[in-house]
Amino acid sequence: MDRSSVPDRLGRFFLPDPRSKFLGARWLFLRALGVFHFSVFYSLAHQIRGLVGDAGILPCSELFAFLHARLGISRYFLVPSLLWLAPNDGGLVALVLAGLYFSLLLILNVAPRVSLVVCGVCFLSFVAAARDFSSYQSEGMLLDATAAAFLLAPRGFRPGLGAACPPSRAARFLVLWEGFRIYFESGIAKLASGDPTWRNLKAMDHYYENGPLPTWIGWWAQQLPEGFHRFTAGATLAIELVVVFGVFFSRRRVRLVTFAILTLLQLGIIATANYCFLNHLVLATGFLLVADDDLPFRLPEAVRYVPTKLRLRASAIWIGWLFYASIAVFAFAGAPEPISFLGFPASVLEPFRLANRYGLFARMTNVRYEIEFEASTDGVTYVTYPFKYKPQALDEAPGIYAPYQPRFEWNLWFCAIDEEGVPVQRVQRVARLTCPWVIRVESRLLERSPFVLALFKDDPLHGAKPRYVRAMLYRYWMTDPRALRATGKYWRREFIDQYIDEAYDEE
């Protein structure tokens, strides 16, 4: 073999590929990414001031004041956020408006690279400042996908399909690599977690009942026979650990079969549970398995495009750094931490939430606990604050609203699962350690903060000021079709205990 062939081939890997047959897949993936960003900022438009605003649950101004007092110039690197410029309601609203505007431009295929940068920076600015309300794996997935998509996207203001700027094989590989890692690392994490339900295939027995925000389809799926749940548990492991390797094959049949199987898995999850944009995003990475020739219509051919040496080198460095950093977390999926010499590139990217570790559904929850808030004007009669999305009313069917993400209600589910296996007498003590922000919710409700009240469906006191607010813990079960016909109820529940200390007005 000619020695020059290796660097030549490596160079062609990073160059825009004039023979690319994935113009349509790239176009669709970028439009989908715009939709996901729009859903994020749209949901934040309704929640952000209640979550981290000046009168919210965890004001970002408190975080920035704390960091400013204790850190030097490194604070801008450790917490990269535009909110350093204005850590207040005005800055939060500006962030959301910019995100909405540029995500809409990305959907419309206007200046896709610029739109991706602005969407990514605005989203990172929120994630870095939101503490408990941005601690999900989906955050890292979206930021990873946005960073990879920047290298995949065509240049120009109105590039159309981007035939004049075809994607490089390296950029396409980076997106597929993220999708592969999400699947494979999640499969490894399931086996490495020590949860016996994945090994004995009982993990899905109560999955639909105990997940964060189920749908009405999930309610019916829970009623299916035990054999179905065993099959889906085994199929999930097989797909995540074996089938997903098909993303690296170029043969048409392997690509399309892999795409079909992965898509069916994600559609099943989307139909039965509301995981915001998470599964939509994972599904969208699979678009890049479908070539233009696989479509029933013809698309324009890619043309030769040669970038400047500076752009080519910058692209190669960015792709190489992201890939190398992700190798650290991929190679040690299921381990506590990657070894240091591999972990350094990932540690540099960590403040930017890039090259993340994934491990979806590594441990399954065995019970469903729910927290709800009650208020009283006299300390005797209490009324309940109704939620917008999560299970509460026993006769209300679970809804479908993903990719919208109700972060407040989502976080309450995570607080509640911390109580699994905790003796009743220790519930409040554990809650103070794991979710102290719940007390802040009580305090804001005492103050009648309009932005925190807006996180609920309505005000049960109809404008009256509460003197007492408390959080109560319940255990929930799904009913069955016979009980539904007899009582009209989708849920039954049992009171467990007061979740955390009651807040009261001393005046």
Indicate residue ranges for each PLM-predicted region.
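Alpha-helical membrane-anchoring segments
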Residues: 2-507
